[in-house]
């Protein structure tokens, strides 16, 4: 990596950051009420909301994590990309239109009303807090890595700068700033990925060169489980593993708090549907670009990165990343592989655009989760449950304080992150989806869904998912290994279940069984929060 800070890169990123600050400032002027802070006054159109959905949902786990996993495993995550994009239209059918018709303010509102229990806000809030901390952490890690690429500074200093920037526009602008900034950030990040991918394809002489680079780096890259045991990696060695990778992120768009709340901000039901179209279209182009960067990253780093060139071309990509890690104190340096591949192009304009795009996606995701969690705590806990008059009189102030606290907590975790950004993302997804998705989806579409099922599923699946993931990660060495492999089979590698994805269908099974065994809800509640909301959606 070149040690000199390139003024072109800094100039491009500075323009982007100025735009963020301007949007944050003018959003604060437009901030007239708590409703503006929490749900942007429900005035957002389809294109803006679609762009905001993309940049919030497709986090640094996508921009850094997806290419990093291709770099690690040597297998292009086609199924993961397809799963995420295909999961977007599902949201239009399952949750988006129905929830916009209901028009809540907080993610917990529907659960409390549908199941007739305000105390559910406590437990839902705890689960959302866990997801928020994981996601804000991975977003701050992403920001710091791009700041390292921009300013060639130590990772921790870059992390401080990135956290302060996010604090400024989230704490002061709320959902209005978050939404408009997210829309602008979607354009920047998508354009950045497309430009970087196009430049790599051009430098390699076209798609034939891309194919050659991929095969040179990973001889088994095109093999599927049908070729087992001759597969790229243990974690893609079976069809169960492939299905696991597919479903980790598939249902998140319809059920994760930070995307669901975006359906609350739009003008009407039709706008909610159309916003998903725009998100799917632009997100698809973004992901194809990331795949191209990922499968060529190793080749580009070894052949053209300044560190490898300075060593006479005798360094592996892993060794190059090791030098970067030692120089800047980066915790999970594999996440830097995508940036290193673009650095290998030797084009400061493209690197500047990529870094601006990387900051955009990281800031958008961190902001989306920060606003989601401060709504849960400041509104649901303080006002709805604890009846604090001060919080009710000054909801925006308390929301800002909470956002600040969560960004600070995530900052300290990001100093030495516990896993790769894609791993943190998958962990958050599985924990939240297996615990809360059954109650949301079946609550809307199944009359028999009961309060007891909601409580039991949320509690049991939350603790089980936390334990299973951590045992697989800490005891067996990786989250992709089924957490009881050693106990049941005496071999940690027998069954590969990425992020313990079996927990998601299990959550639905538990919910259905408990619902059938417990007292059904009142007819009036079913009519209002199930039948009416799903009629003609």
Q: In which residue ranges do the predicted regions lie?
A:
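Membrane-embedded helix-loop-helix hairpins and adjacent transmembrane boundary segments
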Residues: 1-537
């Amino acid at each position: 990596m070149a040690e000199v800070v390139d003024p072109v890169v800094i100039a491009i990123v500075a323009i982007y950051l100025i735009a963020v600050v301007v949007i944050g400032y003018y959003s604060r002027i437009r901030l007239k009420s708590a409703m503006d802070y929490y749900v942007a006054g429900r005035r957002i159109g389809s294109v803006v909301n679609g762009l905001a959905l993309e940049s919030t949902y497709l986090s640094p786990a996508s921009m850094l994590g997806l290419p990093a996993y291709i770099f690690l495993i040597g297998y292009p995550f086609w199924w993961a990309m397809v799963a995420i994009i295909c999961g977007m239209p599902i949201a239009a059918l399952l949750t988006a239109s129905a929830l916009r018709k209901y028009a809540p303010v907080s993610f917990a509102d529907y659960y409390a009303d549908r199941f007739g229990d305000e105390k559910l806000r406590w437990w839902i809030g705890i689960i959302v807090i866990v997801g928020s901390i994981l996601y804000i952490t991975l977003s701050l890690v992403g920001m710091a890595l791009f700041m390292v690429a921009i300013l060639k500074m130590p990772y921790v200093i870059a992390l401080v700068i990135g956290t302060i920037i996010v604090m400024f526009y989230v704490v002061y602008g709320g959902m209005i700033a978050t939404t408009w900034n997210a829309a602008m950030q979607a354009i920047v990040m998508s354009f950045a990925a497309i430009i970087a991918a196009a430049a790599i394809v051009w430098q390699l002489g076209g798609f034939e060169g891309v194919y050659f680079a991929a095969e040179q780096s990973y001889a088994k890259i095109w093999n599927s489980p049908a070729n087992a045991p001759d597969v790229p990696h243990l974690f893609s060695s079976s069809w169960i593993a492939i299905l696991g990778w597919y479903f980790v992120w598939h249902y998140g768009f319809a059920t994760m708090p930070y995307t669901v709340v975006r359906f609350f901000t739009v003008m009407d039901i039709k706008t909610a549907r159309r916003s998903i179209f725009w998100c799917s279209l632009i997100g698809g182009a973004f992901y194809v670009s990331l795949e191209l960067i990922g499968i060529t990253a190793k080749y580009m780093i070894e052949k053209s990165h300044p560190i490898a060139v300075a060593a006479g071309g005798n360094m592996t990509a892993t060794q190059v990343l090791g030098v970067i890690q030692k120089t800047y104190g980066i915790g999970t340096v594999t996440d830097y592989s995508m940036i290193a591949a673009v650095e290998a192009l030797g084009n400061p304009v493209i690197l500047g655009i990529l870094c601006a795009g990387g900051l955009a996606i990281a800031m958008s995701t961190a902001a989306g989760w920060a606003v989601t969690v401060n709504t849960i705590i400041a509104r649901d806990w303080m006002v709805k449950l604890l009846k604090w008059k001060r919080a009710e009189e000054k909801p925006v102030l308390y929301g800002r304080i909470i956002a600040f606290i969560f960004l600070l907590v995530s900052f300290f975790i990001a100093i030495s992150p516990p896993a790769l950004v894609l791993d943190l993302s998958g962990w958050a997804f599985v924990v939240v989806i297996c615990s809360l998705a059954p109650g949301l989806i079946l609550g809307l579409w199944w009359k028999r869904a009961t309060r007891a099922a909601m409580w039991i599923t949320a509690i049991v699946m939350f603790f089980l998912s936390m334990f299973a993931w951590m045992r697989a990660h800490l005891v067996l060495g990786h989250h992709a290994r089924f957490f009881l492999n050693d106990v049941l089979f005496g071999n940690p590698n027998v069954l590969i279940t990425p992020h313990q994805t079996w927990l998601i269908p299990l959550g639905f099974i538990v919910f259905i069984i408990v619902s059938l065994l417990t007292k059904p809800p009142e007819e009036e509640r079913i009519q209002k929060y199930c039948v009416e909301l799903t009629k003609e959606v």
